[in-house]
Amino acid sequence: MAGDDLVETKKGSSKNSKDSNESKLKQKSPAEFFAENKNIAGFDNPGKSLYTTVRELVENALDSAESISELPEVEVTIEEIVKSKFNSMIGLIDRERVDTQLYDDYETEKARGKRLAKEARASEIQAKNLASGKKNKEPGVSKVLKARGEASYYKVTCKDNGKGMPHDDIPNMFGRVLSGTKYGLKQTRGKFGLGAKMALIWSKMSTGLPIEISSSMKSQNYVTFCRLDIDIHRNIPHIHLHEKKGNKEKWHGAEIQVVIEGNWTTYRSKILHYMRQMAVITPYAQFLFRFISETPEKNVTIKFTRRTDVMPPIPIETKHHPSSVDLLLIKRLITDTSKKTLLQFLQNEFVNINKTLAARLIGEMGPDFGPSMAVKSVTSQQMVRIHQLFRQAKFDDPSGDCLSPAGEYNLRLGIIKELHPDMVATYSGSAQVFEGHPFIVEAGVSLGGRDVKQGINIFRFANRIPLLFEQGADVVTRTALKRINWNSYKINQTQDKIGVFVSIVSTKIPFKGTGKEYIGDDISEIATAVKSAIQQCCIQLKSKIVKRLQAREQQERKRSLSRYIPDATGAVYEVLKQMTEEHKTKRKRYGEEDIVMLDKVSKQIITKETLKEKLAEHVEQVDYEMALEYATQSGVSEEPRENIYLQHLDPNKSNFIDLHSPTFVFRLML
């Protein structure tokens, strides 16, 4: 019995130990969470990871330059790294295969025979087509001989002329997830606040190589160089090298270099579309994009030149609107505030609450609250009361002054610069509000243009960054395709080349989905504003289209009249000749004016050619009078409304010639 008891005790002890191990709490760092859920941040696969890395680095570069009001100059380079070069970078020696059948891409003799036979048949068909003059199809890419585990590697480098980073802050800025400078309430380009940190995590997961950062701030006589990676489990930077170098060129900005696994082939078009759309929404920036391949003919170099020096204002950090806060935020604001009393807290920590309104709110909260009440003494139950009142009370809408839209001028320039449309109209709406957050919708609609397909081509921007994925469910797409009656604006939805550009800026973009790639269609305020902005552009285009149609009809009328001049001249001249003969034989009497004209016909003063000239002059005169009437109705007078000159910078250049037209005066400086 004692032995049995001992056995049972040991079994029980073992069971308790097992339960203890199973119930042991485990924690994950933020870096570990994002490493395991990388699709949330746009790192779904190697191709998407390459695209997202480029996007994060470019947006950081723009933010950095704009923060010091510097016109951005961004250089992006993607360099292809073959397997042998990558192995040498990590110190791995290439090894020949010994057991070939072990590998996923092993090809049996039977499979090889089938492949060769198929290739031979394809070659034979191509030869026959060539002999008969038929056009051959492009040969398909062979599916074989790329191992399942064989990866493609790329070195991504982004250089800017921005603010740079403080020497001591660089390790934490890149090696600690959820630490940064963009967590206040203001309009920001980033979706998660991860920036280059997620690129470093992906580099750590796919190549194991560290990230390299060079940075210098204005007036610094040194350049910081830092090579580091990240301790995923502890969420801290692992510094390999952190030093200062000379800065003889007085350069300021940052250069970031990271080696990652990627797929240029499948995401080439997405990356180039992103760069082009970024050039549309930021025409004041200059982008240089390079792709360097092991095969020189595959190299790509594209320069997106700057079109304007006008930059949007820098977004301003703002305070929370009372209707947009929740209990957690109220608790955090109370914890962080430096104000002593509840009255001061309400007045200074929220927008649209002045001293009078704060006192009224406190009076409405009940006898447990008072203006001089210590804000730090507010209990959890009292916080709930504050929250309930915030949701029920009426507040003025927040101002849109904290936002930084691209601007109608920049949007128009960007569209013209990149698409070269035949017509373009832009519109910038006033600030509106949803859930206590201000937002502004800007829109542009273009007709025609370079590399634009027939039908509706949609370009979406959120906080001045392009959105390229999950377009179908987006509020802009649904509005443009289903809620706009294009025919009523003289626009053919299927035949015309229509570009629809919509940019939404806000302190909180209501993205949908884990990847934050589209804006939902369920917020009526935004949907209404988007529809209105597109319609305003269409109204502008309609007037231009109608004027163009009228001008075309006028030209067609002139061509028609000119085409009938020879026949009309011949018929009239024959009638005049017949009248002259009748007058000579006195078979018919005519008035004095008719006799004078018939006399000129008989003396060959009026001929068929003179009639033709007079009719042509009359058509020209009528055309001129109609054009003048059309110009007057369109708001253009016969004389310039205002003389506007482009003045030479040299004051000594005083010689000029004025060239006048019905719409402007052009002064040519000599």
Curated annotation (Swiss-Prot):
Any single GO BP term: DNA endoreduplication
Gene disruption: observed consequences: Plants are defective in cell elongation and show a severe dwarf phenotype.
Catalytic activity: ATP-dependent breakage, passage and rejoining of double-stranded DNA
Entry's EC annotation: 5.6.2.2
Compartments where found: Nucleus
GO-annotated molecular function: ATP binding; DNA binding; DNA topoisomerase type II (double strand cut, ATP-hydrolyzing) activity; identical protein binding; protein homodimerization activity
Record's keyword terms, sorted: ATP-binding, DNA-binding, Isomerase, Nucleotide-binding, Nucleus, Topoisomerase
InterPro entries listed in its UniProt record: HATPase_C_sf (IPR036890), Ribosomal_Su5_D2-typ_SF (IPR020568), Ribsml_uS5_D2-typ_fold_subgr (IPR014721), TopoVI_B (IPR005734), TopoVI_B_transducer (IPR015320)
Region of interest: Disordered: 1-30
Major site of localization recorded for this protein: nucleus
Residues noted as binding ATP in the record, renumbered to the chain: 60, 160, 181-182, 190-197, 516
Basic and acidic residues bias (residue ranges): 7-25
Organism domain of life: Eukaryota
GO cellular component: DNA topoisomerase type II (double strand cut, ATP-hydrolyzing) complex; nucleus
Tissue expr: Highly expressed in leaves, stems, flowers and seedlings.
Role this protein plays: Component of the DNA topoisomerase VI involved in chromatin organization and progression of endoreduplication cycles. Relaxes both positive and negative superturns and exhibits a strong decatenase activity. The B subunit binds ATP. Involved in cell-elongation processes.
Family designation: Belongs to the TOP6B family.
NCBIfam families: PRK04184.1
Quaternary assembly: Homodimer. Heterotetramer of two TOP6A and two TOP6B subunits. Interacts with SPO11-2, but not with SPO11-1, RHL1 or BIN4.
Protein name: DNA topoisomerase 6 subunit B
Gene: TOP6B
